[in-house]
C-alpha cells in the first residue's frame, strides 16, 4: 500500500533538495584515519543554545547533551559545585527555561530527568510490529556496501568510484537478496524500478512516505543520524569539495539510499503502520522547542563549568612559584598550544630561570601541502579550516637525493606487494605455513614491547617551488609577530612540533597535531627554522624592526607526546659555535622529559613509574598509551608570565600573545578565528564522546576493526564509528575527561575582542550560544570580565565569602 499525505501542499523537487542539504549540514564531518582530526560533533547546531540543541538531537538521535543528573548531584554534595556557582548559573539562565526558585533547581538536580527516545523511523516502527530487526538489517547492508565504496586502499578488490554513491549502491542492491531473505519482498526489484539519479529518488520516496514540508528537514536529519559515521564520511567529502569551490553529493546520495529502504518498508507493512507513521510525521513537523527539563540540565552544566572557572581564577591569582630570570634567555623553545605541551613546558622552565617557552599553533603559521620522502601523497599539514598555500617536499634536488628517493619508492612498493600477497584470497592460506617462521622474531619483539630500531628522519623539507623573497619575508614576519617573538632572542631557539609514537592503534593520527591536519609537526618546524636562518630574510626583518642577533640559530624539533622525548634536527643547520648551547639544551630536555613522564604516570593506569611510559608506547595491547587531550578545559592567550610557574595540570591550551605589540589587533583576530576554533572542536569532541558515547563516540577499542582504511567498526560490520573510543575518556573506573565546555581567556581590551566577534558571526555564535565561555583578563592576568553574549560583558571579581565570581555591572 502506498501512502501520500492528505491535505498537504505539493512539494517541489527544489524544496526537497534544499531540506536535504540543510539536513546534511546538521551532521559533523568525519576525517579518515590517515589524517583524523578532532571535530565538533555539534557543528551543525552551533546556531542553537545548549537546551535547544538538546531538544533537536533528542529527536534526531535519542541522546542527551549533558551528564546524568546524579553526576551533578554528587558534585553538589561534595562541594565541588558551590552554592554560588549554582546561583550564578541559575541567574544567567532564561527565565522560561529555569525552575521558579533555586530550591526547586536543587530538588530537580537530585531527580533523574526523563530522556524520551528519538522520533521513530519506518524501520523502527516495522521492527516493533513484527520483531524483525529492520534497523539492524538496514545498517548492516548499507555498511557492507559503504565500506567498499568509500574504501581508501584497504580492500584488495576495490569498488570503482566513477559513479555517484547512489548509482553505485543501486547496482549492488539490485542483486542483493539479503533483504528478501529477511522478509522484505521485492526489494531488489523495487530498487531496479527506482529513478536512476538520487534527486529523483528523493522526490519519489518523499511522495510515497507522505511527508509534509514541515517534516522534511527533521526527518532527513534523523535518517542521516541513523547512518552513523557513513553519513559523516560523506559530509567530509562535501567539506573537502567546498574548500576548493566545488561540491559533492555523497550525503544526498546516502539519504536517498536510506529513504529507499523506508519507502520499501512502508510499502510492505502498509495499513498496519499508518496510525503510528502519521503520528510520527506530525511529530517531525512540530518545531523544535527546548523544555524545562532541558533548561535544568543546561543550568547544572553551567554550574559545573563555573566551578571549574572559579578554581582557574584562583590559580591565576596566585603568586607564581618561580619567575624568569632577567636578561637574555639561555634557551627559547616554542611549542604547540596543545595541552600536553603545558606539562613539558612547566617541567623545562623549572630547570633553569633562563629558560623561556612559548606557545603557538603547531603548524607554525605555515599552511603547507607536504610530500614526504619517497611518496607522491600530498599531506595537508595545516588546520582543516584552511587550504594549503605553499607546497613542499623533503630533500634537495640533487642526484644523491633523487637516487635515495627512488630507492625508498621501490622499497615501499615491494612492501605493499608483499602485504597484498599475504592477504590475497588464495596465497594467504599457504603464506602462514611457508613464511610463518620468519615472523617469530618480530612476534616476540612486538609481544614483549621491546625497543624497535629508529627509522631514519626524512631529509630537511624545502619548498617544492622557489618562493620569492617578498613571500619568504612576509611569512617570517607574520609568524614572528603572531608568536609575539620580535625581540629578546636567545642564542638557541628551538621550534618544536609534536607527534605521538604508538603501535597497533587505528586512531594514531588523532594523537598527532590537530593544527597540522592530523600529522606530526616536525615538517612545519623545520621549514620555519630554515626560513628564520636565511640571511636575506633576517636582513629584511631588520628593516621591519625585527632584529635577530647574528649569533641566534633556529632549529626544528619534535616533541613526542607519548614518551616526552624530544628530537632536535641539529643536522639541518650545523653550527660549531652552538655546540655547547645544543648540548646543554639536550641535557635540559632529557631532564624535563623525566619530570613530565613522572607527572603523567600519576594519571595513567598501570604506570607507577616514569620508566613505564616508553614501554606503553611500544605495547601493542595497550589501550591507553597516553591521554592525549583528555581533561582540556581552558584556552589562554596572554603573555607567558600570566601562567608560568602555575600547575595547570595539562588542561590548558597556552598561546603566547601580547596585545601591546599587536597593532590593529590582526594577531588577536587570527587567534580568535583559527586556534580558538580548533581548540573548540577538540574540546567539544571530548565533550560529545563523554555525554553521548553511543552516537558521538567510537565505542570499545577491543572490538575495533578498521574498514576501508577510513574508520573503525565494532565487530565485523555495521555503522562506522566516529569520535573518541571510550578508553580515551575513561580509565576503567572513572572518567579521565570532565565534560566541560572550553573557557577562553584572552588578555586584550574588551573593545578589540568585541570588534572581532562582530566581524566574524560564525565565531561570535559559538560564544553567544555558550558553546564556549569567554573571559577578558586584566593587566595583571586576572579573569576580570565575562562575555555574556550580544557583545556585552559582566565584571567579575573574586568573592571569597560566597565562593563564586559574582556579577558586578554590565558594560
From Swiss-Prot:
Q: What Gene Ontology cellular component terms go with this record?
A: plasma membrane
Named cofactor requirement(s): Zn(2+)
Assign the protein's first listed, main location to one coarse class.
membrane
Q: Per the record's keyword annotation, is Membrane included, yes or no? A: yes
Q: Read off the Pfam families from this record.
A: DabA
Name the positions where Zn(2+) binds.
336, 338, 498, 513
Bilayer topology term? Peripheral membrane protein
**Which protein family is it in?**
Belongs to the inorganic carbon transporter (TC 9.A.2) DabA family.
Quaternary organization: Forms a complex with DabB.
What's the protein called, per UniProt? Probable inorganic carbon transporter subunit DabA
Organism equals: Rhodospirillum centenum (strain ATCC 51521 / SW)
Q: Which gene encodes it?
A: dabA
